[in-house]
Amino acid sequence: MADFHISKVHELMMNQKNIRNISVIAHVDHGKSTLTDCLVIKAKIVSKDSGGGRYMDSREDEQQRGITIKSSAISLHFQVQKDVLEAYTKEGDTNGTEFLINLIDSPGHVDFSSEVTAALRVTDGALVVVDCVDGICVQTETVLGQAMNERIIPTLVLNKLDRAILELEYPQEKLGEVLRRRVEGFNAKLSTLGYNFKVESLLPEKNEISFCSGLQGWGFTLRQFARFYLEKFNMNGFEGERKLTNFLWSHKVSCTSDDPFDASIKHIAKPNPARSPFVVYVLNPIYKVKELCNNGKVEEIKEYLKFYKVDFKGVVLTGSGKSLFKEVMKTWLPAADCILEQIALKLPSPLQSQKLRYDYLYEGPADDEVANAIKMCDGSDEAPVSMYVSKMIPSNDNRFIAFGRVFSGKIFPGMKIRVQEPGYSPGSEELSNTSLIHNKSVLRTVVMMGRGYKDVPNCPAGNIIGIIGIDDCLKKTGTITNREAAHNIRSMKFSVSPVVKVAVSAKRPEDLGKLQEGLNKLAQSDPLCVVERNDKGQNTIACAGSLHLEICLKDLQDQYAKVPIIADDPLVTYFEGISCAVSDSKMTKSANKHNRIYMTVEPLDQNIVDNLKDVKSDQAKTMATNFREKLDIRDDWIRKIWCYAPEVNPLNLLVDGTKGISIINEIKEHVNTGFRAAVNDGPLIGEVMRGLKFELKDAVLHADAIHRGINQLLQPVKNLCKGLLLAAGPILYEPIYEVEITTPNDYSGAVTTILLSKRGTAEDFKTLPGNDTTMITGTLPVKESFTFNEDLKSGSRGKAGASMRFSHYSILPGNLEDPNSLMFKTVEAVRKLKKMNPAPPTPDSFFDRL
């Protein structure tokens, strides 16, 4: 790696004021990776002449498809001019001119949104990239919402100016209007996102927005053009720069000439989009250069750009047209320079960010030792260690690197640490809790460098790091600490769900062991992918969408199992629910007939289901407070909640409604275990239950504990929960996509017909300005989405396309009483695919009688 030393990175890791941890986020194909390449080249990680580009896309399928599939990190070392820092940052906010940029390039395709979530969790700022022609698209909104949920500060890059100028040939006036609309649209969207965390509008005149062509490697903020014109306006210094920057974005003033160097030009207080300061002083010079490049007038280009103090020394300008324009523009306005300034000046350091995020990130009390250390980003040797592992990255030795962020303390090789899995709560001695703790030693600490990694001696708070040696005790994510009383860092909340699944098997029976090992590694490597094995021995993989599933199957066969596999047709992930309550207690007996359990069930309020993950707590008092403050619910039963399930993403409750049973707490863990087992394996089609509140009403128990152990109680509780679901009007919930279809106006009718034929809805029609295109937004059941894009292209001669993202779960139409209904047919088909008995069991088959 030319001119790059890992020792310099480690030195800068100690200077928290000058660390910038950032994610690059965008809609697919909006140009994130090409912009990232500009920064990597600027940092001299690779040479500007190295072919291919897309340095951060290390996978072969990423290079072939031209999209990012896995987020990848790199640590870059940059310098910013001292006078610029002094002028545009507060005193004390920075320390020196050298900056460490820990950058994560994340995917733009909606199927890989979980990778974006994992990146945002460990960063402090986001570089949001938006195609200036297409504007905010469905995935832009998704990732921006994720950033707001994680309390990440954004800054905006309006990219692909080359597309507007060279390909679509926008006139200056139109481009100026489009860019202004993009800024306004972004800020309007920003204002609607986030609940407890709001950020102010981003403004070009504050240099919070840059205008770039990542493909050609050029870009600018208004500050750069303001500096060009200081002499013309008889101004100097940074105060003059600020005034000119405000002037350049003003829409209330217009110019009397198109030539920025016309000596007679005047500025009048009358709006005129064709002669706004931005068009005249910023866009017109760029279009002038384009015209000269088209005619191959190299000497005239050099002469014209003397006005802007451009030095072409060492730059060979030849040819004409697009290639010459690219060379001239990236020499005049290098994209890396303006983006670097944005990152250094407008995004927060860990010291600033963690003051905003600590109370959201940390599950424990906001004033305990660990919370205070996170808040202050304390990286001293004495500080408690708190690190969050957001994903596991495969290494070359068939193991995994635990990748994450150190929020407090310092981590080094040989250090003794506690690895706490999601769901752990300090103070609880229940087996289900203590099994989530692992005492380990750190073998190595490494920084990620795109396609590889480098060892560092240690890592203090505020940095992104990889740890080697703990992959055997982390399934996907977790908290690392060195304090017994430390609570977990909050688990991530994904914007997508694993709604598409497929059954997989080994092509050769003798490869079953390798398949199982490969499935475990696949589940560990992907933040969202869920691998399950049912009691019939069938393995399934659940993913966010069809592309995510395709990638996971390829990785399973080629990278993890390394054996031929067979994949069945894809299914969608359903939830099992109920439509009514069962208020008369139902009963089951233990195998020895000495114990009886009585329960009822009722549907949970949807508001509780949607927010259960955020309000749950192991402490009854805290739980009651959370329900009251966040959901405005004050019911007495809240203090009697025994258990939530599933554990990671709870959707159901078990409440203790018994009275006067002195030994009831002695069976609590056994009942909870049976409840969890039932919730994860519903009786209809073996899927997870959703929105059920089970209440334990009574228990008749043997006096001797040996006769009421878990072996006696687990199965009766499991049976009771399953039977209650079947007795309460069982329903299925199916996943629904929000769909955004772009189609020529002439085909909007045909496209709408296709959408409606697949049980979709068309909720909004918007004509896009300037290109005779309609955008249709609506919903589409995931089950109907597998061939949707192909059907659209067939019905529009290849001219329509759709973007889809997970929206919500909705009740599947029909019922189990009508053989012609969709629900009946779905239950029948899924049970057949899962090799279950064709008809669901009856409620009474699970209950016992006195």
Swiss-Prot record:
CDD domains: aeEF2_snRNP_like_IV (cd01681), eEF2_snRNP_like_C (cd04096), EF2 (cd01885), EF2_II (cd16268), EF2_snRNP_III (cd16261). It is an enzyme of class 3 (hydrolase). SMART domains: EFG_C, EFG_IV. The keyword Ribosomal protein does not apply. GO terms for cellular component: cytosol; ribonucleoprotein complex. Keywords: Cytoplasm, Elongation factor, GTP-binding, Hydrolase, Nucleotide-binding, Protein biosynthesis, RNA-binding, rRNA-binding. Gene3D superfamilies: 3.30.230.10, 3.30.70.240, Elongation Factor G (Translational Gtpase), domain 3, P-loop containing nucleotide triphosphate hydrolases, Translation factors. InterPro entries: EFG_II, EFG_III/V, EFG_V-like, EFTu-like_2, G_TR_CS, P-loop_NTPase, Ribosomal_Su5_D2-typ_SF, Ribsml_uS5_D2-typ_fold_subgr. Its EC number is 3.6.5.-. Pathway: Protein biosynthesis; polypeptide chain elongation. It catalyses: GTP + H2O = GDP + phosphate + H(+). The keyword Nucleotide-binding applies. GO terms for molecular function: GTP binding; GTPase activity; rRNA binding; translation elongation factor activity. Residues 17-351 form the tr-type G domain. PROSITE patterns: G_TR_1, G_TR_2. Pfam families: EFG_C (PF00679), EFG_III (PF14492), EFG_IV (PF03764), GTP_EFTU (PF00009), GTP_EFTU_D2 (PF03144). Belongs to the TRAFAC class translation factor GTPase superfamily. Classic translation factor GTPase family. EF-G/EF-2 subfamily. PANTHER family: ELONGATION FACTOR-LIKE GTPASE 1, TRANSLATION ELONGATION FACTOR-RELATED. Catalyzes the GTP-dependent ribosomal translocation step during translation elongation. During this step, the ribosome changes from the pre-translocational (PRE) to the post-translocational (POST) state as the newly formed A-site-bound peptidyl-tRNA and P-site-bound deacylated tRNA move to the P and E sites, respectively. Catalyzes the coordinated movement of the two tRNA molecules, the mRNA and conformational changes in the ribosome. This is Elongation factor 2. It comes from Encephalitozoon cuniculi (strain GB-M1) (Microsporidian parasite).
